[in-house]
Design a protein with these regions (language model features):
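Short, low-hydrophobicity acidic/polar segments
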Residues: 1-141, 162-167
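Intrinsically disordered, low-complexity terminal/linker regions enriched in Pro/Ser/Gly
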Residues: 146-167
Length: 167
């Protein structure tokens, strides 16, 4: 199943703590999805009153830095597996008070996504277009980045290359 990493950072004297690579209330606890999310270890609140921020990211990894976590999309996304492996999801639930309920973390896709439509025209009839061997390449795209796990910002790094999109 899919795996996400969860960090939990407690508030101190009512003020949000700062996410760190280690030393948080919980550091990068793997949660695996089957029919529901299952943590690799039991997780408990610090006490009955201390609020916490919950940080979630996908896919699960072993970040040595939470402010510049390296991630690379596949330049060849022609297969569904490579396309899906190029997705990065991040989310936060801020200021959560201790509760016996599950903590809900809203997540977002932080990498770019593009939908390309090709259609007949300019010398192509529907029939000739359908018979043509058409390929698409997206040029001048940086496929490497760092993700700041504390705020979800992404910074492109490295050289630009060509990406073959999923069809």
């Amino acid at each position: 199943g899919d795996e996400v990493g969860i960090y939990v950072v407690n508030y101190v004297d009512g003020v949000p703590g700062t996410l760190a690579a280690s030393g948080n209330h919980y550091d990068n606890v793997k949660h695996t999805y089957s029919t529901s999310w299952t943590p690799a270890e039991d997780m408990y609140w610090l006490d009955k009153t201390t609020k916490a921020d919950f940080y979630c990211y996908y896919p699960y990894g072993n970040p040595s830095s939470v402010t510049a976590y390296p991630f690379a999309v596949n330049a060849n996304q022609s297969t569904l597996a490579n396309y899906k492996a190029s997705d990065f999801i991040w989310g936060i639930a801020s200021g959560v008070s201790p509760t016996s309920n599950l903590v809900q973390i809203a997540t977002n896709h932080v990498m770019s996504n593009m939908t390309i439509y090709l259609e007949a025209g300019d010398g192509f009839t529907d029939e000739t277009f359908a018979a043509a061997n058409v390929s698409v390449a997206v040029r001048n795209v940086k496929t490497n980045a760092t993700v700041n796990l504390s705020d979800g910002t992404v910074t492109a790094t490295g050289s630009a290359t060509e990406v073959t999109p999923y069809n």
